[in-house]
């Protein structure tokens, strides 16, 4: 059961990054045909059903672990539950949570919980997972993410806590911590100040990154898509121009030079503007041979080249750097910022180029906190490439990078901020669906959820 849960949820995250997340945050751009999502015509995204399906299995893992007194499995189940629910609530807002998998209790139409309550529940579950996962809690059979190591899962639990707490940075709420009501800032600090009892990622060896094996079912999920469809996903002009400006070696990891430039030996990278119509995108810069696509070998041809990313060490360092600049914790922000960038380079097998940190826009502005935060968040955006929808979730909070709406969008020049609830909810769970709309607002991609209010 556990391998199927891990593989299924990670694959859903990867597939949604490919088809939607990479486009809306302008890592990639769509060309030639079916450019609707890049133009914000978001009729529906295949996110809800598969993730709730995985959650039903997660609940079984947790219940069996409790019955059999297997704390390591309960801890892993709580981590997976929190991560999957974080994807759902961050994408939709209020969603079924407390009654979401209670069919066995006779609840076939679960209520939609408020997003604030879901966040409190996720943070509580991750704290409980941290307590359950110990060196003595036992190995974890079927663990295709961390090969059965409970301490790796413990680090993931606490790293996810940092991610969720940072997402609450604009909310004036208090959280329960050991019976006391504390601020979001203090909750964050309680983790970073306790590496012995609440460890987080300390190297790329801790990355929550599913390694694919190169054969079904354990292969990169885009490997089985149609090759013609894959080639309609190009590097975005936004990402390409940013990486070229910084002479950033990750450009050749994320994408390929244009076919024409490979032929003539010049090896040029040309990104495509987001949201062009089918005809305009297909002919941009002279056509497909003069546009840079995704790295074909890494993200299509070799089924075990890329990894399914949940969270990385680089992200943890960026979270800490941002927290330092926000006066949440005391440490050196510049050191964390530079180490985060170096960790991202290392993650992709690249060395930090000489002089990289001396460039304007990369060199750390120690006397300008606002500019420092912008650079931290820009570099974090780069590092979150293909990490589910995390780049989009982070942009909604920070507005970084400062991107323009896609060119020929059909959403009145508004960048979407949520997914629509699936149409099936309107008929199968109508009363609870309507109650969520009454609280949150219309079922629109432009409706701001509680996190964004």
Model-derived segments and spans:
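Pocket-edge structural micro-motifs
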Residues: 9, 86, 253-255, 380, ...
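A broad detector of the eukaryotic-type serine/threonine protein kinase catalytic domain
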Residues: 10, 63-66, 381
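Structured, solvent-exposed acidic/aromatic patches
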Residues: 26-80, 84-347, 369-373
């Amino acid at each position: 059961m556990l391998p199927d849960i891990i593989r299924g949820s990670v694959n859903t995250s990867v597939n949604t990054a490919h088809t939607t997340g990479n486009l809306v945050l302008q890592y990639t751009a769509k060309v030639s045909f079916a450019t609707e999502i890049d133009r914000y015509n978001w009729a529906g995204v295949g996110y809800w059903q598969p993730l709730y399906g995985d959650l039903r299995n997660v609940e079984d893992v947790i219940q069996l672990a409790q019955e059999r007194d297997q704390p390591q499995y309960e801890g892993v189940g709580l981590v997976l539950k929190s991560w999957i629910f974080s994807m759902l609530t961050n994408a939709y807002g209020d969603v079924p949570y407390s009654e979401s998998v209670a069919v066995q209790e006779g609840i076939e139409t679960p209520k939609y919980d408020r997003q604030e309550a879901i966040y409190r529940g996720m943070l509580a579950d991750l704290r409980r997972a941290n307590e359950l996962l110990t060196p003595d809690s036992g190995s974890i059979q079927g663990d295709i993410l961390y090969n059965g190591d409970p301490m790796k899962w413990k680090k993931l639990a606490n790293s996810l806590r940092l991610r969720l707490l940072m997402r609450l940075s604009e909310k004036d709420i208090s959280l329960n911590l050991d019976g006391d009501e504390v601020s979001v800032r203090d909750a964050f600090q309680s983790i970073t100040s306790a590496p012995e009892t609440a460890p987080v990622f300390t190297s790329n060896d801790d990355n929550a990154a599913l390694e694919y094996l190169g054969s079904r079912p354990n292969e990169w999920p885009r490997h089985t898509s149609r090759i013609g469809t894959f080639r309609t996903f190009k590097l975005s002009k936004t990402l390409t121009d940013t990486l070229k400006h910084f002479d950033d070696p990750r450009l050749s990891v994320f994408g390929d030079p244009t076919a024409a430039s490979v032929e003539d030996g010049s090896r040029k990278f040309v990104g495509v503007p987001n949201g062009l119509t089918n005809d305009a995108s297909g002919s941009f810069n002279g056509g497909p041979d003069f546009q840079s696509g995704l790295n074909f070998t890494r993200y299509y041809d070799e089924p075990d080249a890329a990894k399914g990313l949940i969270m990385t060490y680089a992200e943890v360092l960026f979270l800490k750097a941002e927290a330092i600049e926000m006066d949440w914790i005391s440490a050196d922000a510049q050191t964390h910022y530079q180490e985060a960038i170096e960790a991202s380079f290392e993650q992709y097998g690249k060395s930090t180029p000489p002089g990289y940190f001396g460039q304007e826009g990369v060199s750390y502005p120690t006397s300008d906190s606002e500019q420092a935060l912008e650079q931290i968040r820009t570099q974090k955006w780069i590092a979150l490439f293909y990490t589910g929808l995390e780049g989009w979730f982070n942009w909604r909070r920070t507005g970084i990078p400062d991107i323009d709406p896609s060119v020929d969008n059909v959403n009145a020049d508004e960048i979407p901020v949520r997914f629509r609830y699936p149409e099936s909810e309107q008929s199968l769970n109508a009363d609870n669906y309507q109650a969520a709309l009454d609280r949150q607002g219309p079922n629109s991609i432009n409706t701001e959820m509680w996190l964004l209010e």
